[in-house]
Amino acid sequence: MDADFDFVVDYDVPDKISYKIELLEKFVGKDPEAVLIFYGGEPMLCIEEIRQIMDNVKAKQFNIQTNGLHLNKLEPEYVNRLSTIFVSIDGTEQLTDYYRGEGVYRKVTENIKAAIKNGFNGEIVARMTLMEQTNIYPNIRWLLNNPDYSFQSIHWQLDAGFWKNDFHKRPFPEWVNEKYNPQIRQLTEFWVNTMETQGKVLRLYPLLGVMQSLLLEEESLLRCGSGWANYSIQTDCHIIPCPAMNGMKDYYLGHIQHSHPLQLKKIYVTEPCTSCKILGECGGRCLYANITQRWSNEAYSLVCETVKNLVDSLKTSLPRVKTLIDTERIRLSDFDHLKYNSCEIIP
């Protein structure tokens, strides 16, 4: 994976939609199962465009990934039509504000509660971004049960492998080995214990998605769906395999004016993922990171070790979970979730 690839990047991709909504309406109309996800940047900075799209484009459902700061500015008639809201929050107030700025945690939780009060009854997913200041186990426990807003669904993503020159500036190896990996095992134990004691499968997406595959004995492609089930539309109409690949011209897969959403080229992960022993269980960690290879082999292998640790912890717990299903303490259907909804599953 040691590489320093050059990519043709279009730095002139506009900040906001530069095409007529009718063009998007026609494109999406070719797929009767289309799901639209508002993604950024921060999509709530383009509220008028969100309104226009929801008013005119016929999609099976609408979802959004947002920092949550402007959620109160979109009228309930639109918010309540969203199926899933992914909101960026990293754990406790102290940790979230450390990463995102003073007052962010309080504003986000207030906006979430207001949305629910105004009639939103879809799924709200806490989307955590993890760096070395995060202790994942206590922060997930906090998000699940706290006096501000207790989340029913949580996902987390490691901020690792996305930048070229940050690895040597960070205590990433120490954090992985001393904090993150041990706490993932602790979290898995808590997750299964909750099934045993409460008969409840908590919607912790990285655990939920992989455990379902283990139970069904199925292998998976890239679990977020990027490049083969999910595609992103740039503000200039070009179609890319992953929203993180904005402006990467070598990976433009079409244009909404003349492409068909069900006939787009598929892009899959390559090495080092394709020779990995757990590829079928993992599916690949991130298409953008796999293609750009910002970190060295040695550095990125630590990221892969976090995935192997997560998968191994779930495999270790698999017999207990099967027993709980056999004894009807929980059901296999408790692991059902909407796939390819922009939740990466693999952190």
Sequence positions of predicted segments:
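N-terminal pre-triad scaffold of radical SAM enzymes
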Residues: 1, 33-37, 237, 276
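Short, compositionally biased "basic patch" segments
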Residues: 1-6, 11-23, 82-84, 88
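Short acidic/His/Gly/Ser-rich catalytic and metal-binding motifs that mark active-site loops
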Residues: 1-5, 94, 162-167, 285
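Radical SAM enzyme [4Fe-4S]-AdoMet core and its adjacent flexible, acidic
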Residues: 6-9, 18, 102-109, 113, ...
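C-terminal accessory region of radical SAM enzymes
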Residues: 178-214, 238-290, 320
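Radical SAM enzyme core and accessory elements
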Residues: 236, 271-347
